[in-house]
């Protein structure tokens, strides 16, 4: 305890230095100004704050480091409604006439026509699922789009978001309280609550907060956490990561260390992917030594978590354009910078399709690995496998949105992965775990299928982003990572990329349980004694403030890990049927 207090006090003493050093060279992010002094021993009245002294000390440290004020409220609270009645002029200028439409293609011909029209008009396709395709466009372009579509599609659409500028404005956390409104950048906020709990997950956080948070985790939990870098971005920012794991001092004989890589933020606007990676990291960190499952997984594997592979683009979404997708390196057209990092990998790269159109949202560059950050991660992964005595056995690439679990291949539906049966088996188990966690349904399919085969719809292909050069295919084929998945997180389109902050924790809980099940599946027979996901124990050990409203959600008591993957497609499609939990395993009785 004394050592921990010493570390915290050192951190507090170095607040000024730490915040300045957290800003990358060349960044326009302005560090938060010095906060007003807070007396360490002062405590609010019991009616206002019932936190224990140690909890108050912890929250005070976090407030001091990141300048979080208790007077700040959640951006969606009514107390700030007056300041959010109308987006600022710059938001109206950029997004004022933009809307999001949802189309319902009924045939392969409809899908092909929609994809072709989207390319001709340089439209932003947000998502493709078995039921719909979401497209962002300016209101004045709607007539042009409809003119390029067949009659069957001209009425087969509905408005999804008709106030995009307002939704974008509301998606940012509120600025700090009065007196610092002239500061650039956004500060993290907290909800009005008797307990501040874990402030970091109360809202989306900018890069200038994420990096110091990662340093803090590595400092406080040095026995099993290490902050590392997997590369440097085009603009010179570090691509930070957390490596979690406990290694033997001198293993005899030396065996390759099995590594599971979890990546978020490849596409800058997908904020929920970045928050989810940090949430999963925090749960694994905090529960090591308390949860037998987590302890075993950190002893048997290294877990490398990269919250944002695209730090330049992520910073740009906070500073300029909330809906920016690509990285920020220049292209042949000065006014169209950026490369799609999930189309820049060397395996089955098909950048010829977009080579002449750098303005495309899926522009793959002029050559494989033209995207700096993709190249950096690939070099790091190769170095780990070739020189660092490591084997990457699992890869989870988090994206948004549409709630899908995708497995290789992305480049072609005619190519069959050699481990298809195992990939589908585990993917079905992961989807079931999510449904048991929050009752949300995630579809399972091959990544090549933007719109997939189902019993209710024909097989149509509408997703222009499903192509070669994906990280998913590269890790699976080049590094022989047998269990590689891309997971598209919440939601199914009500908010799209602008998912409100109150969904950070529920989405994080879904993927945390996915990660536990993923790790146990890889352990195989070695996980026999870890045959229960004890949901009640998991909730009991939940760090303070994380559970909140989720405590009211009924959770099953446990089951066998191996059977979590024993799920058929028919079961996945019948989620609305009455189901009864079998207390002896991961199976349902109907």
Curated annotation (Swiss-Prot):
> What is the top-level taxon of the source organism?
Eukaryota
Residues that coordinate or bind Zn(2+): 267, 270, 399
Q: Name one GO biological process term.
A: cell wall organization
Residues binding substrate are 267-270, 325, 342-343, 400-401
Q: Which residues form the signal peptide?
A: 1-22
Maturation-removed propeptide residues: 23-175
Q: A GO molecular function for this record?
A: zinc ion binding
Keywords recorded for this protein, A-Z = Cell wall biogenesis/degradation, Disulfide bond, Glycoprotein, Metal-binding, Secreted, Signal, Vacuole, Zinc
Q: Which residues are glycosylated?
A: 389
Gene3D superfamilies given in the database record: Zn peptidases (3.40.630.10)
Q: What is this protein called?
A: Inactive metallocarboxypeptidase ecm14
Q: Which gene encodes it?
A: ecm14
